[in-house]
Regions:
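Accessory nucleic acid-recognition modules appended to NTPase machines
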Residues: 5-180
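Amphipathic alpha-helical segments of the small helical/lid subdomains adjacent to P-loop NTPase cores
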Residues: 1-3
Length: 180
């Protein structure tokens, strides 16, 4: 991940457990910031969205599923929470493109999107993946590894381009391009 304090800690000590402690402190600070800065009525929904990120990414179809938050959840009920997290820079949204044309934003389906964590290291902490598993691999990590790498690419692209993530899939959902 790109969190300066965590990177500095690893560069000095080379102890993943200390880095994970810092990452968990950062995550806890974000949750406290929800209570300080977010509209009071949105805080429970912010927490639901925030806590769901690893599970949303773990699924084969990584499109954000509101029903994964709550069986009766609807997009309009969670839009403010998602916008708040996005505007705070805590999540990255990647919108489905209905056809690959320019400009991409003209063909974006704003109701169909994927959500990524702002930082790959923090995603590992959110998912409670042992740093040793990340470094050395493990058979249990194979399935989530694709989502983890996809999040890394999203984070890197936003760092290079400043934002505007988009993906494409055909109508039959037999082909997909993760990033355009």
């Amino acid at each position: 991940g790109g969190m300066p304090e965590a990177v500095e800690c690893y560069a000095k000590n080379r102890h993943f457990s200390e880095v994970r402690t810092i990452q968990n402190e950062i995550l806890n600070a974000y949750v406290l910031d929800f209570a300080k800065h977010a509209p009071h009525q949105d805080i429970p929904k912010l927490m639901q969205v925030w806590d769901s990120i690893p599970a949303q990414l773990a699924r084969e179809n990584r499109k954000f599923q509101f029903a994964a938050l709550k069986s009766t959840a609807r997009a309009r009920d969670y839009e403010n929470a998602i916008l708040w997290l996005e505007n705070a820079g805590l999540i990255l949204r990647c919108f489905l493109i209905t056809k690959p044309g320019q400009p991409l934003t003209a063909y974006a389906d704003r109701s169909s999107f994927k959500v990524y964590a702002l930082d790959i290291g923090l995603l590992g902490a959110m998912a409670r993946i042992s740093p040793e598993i990340l470094v050395h691999g493990h058979v249990l990590f194979q399935e989530f590894k694709g989502a983890f790498i996809e999040n890394y690419v999203a984070q890197t692209l936003v760092g290079i381009t400043g934002g505007g993530l988009h993906y494409w899939k055909n109508e039959a959902a037999t082909a997909e391009i993760d990033f355009l």
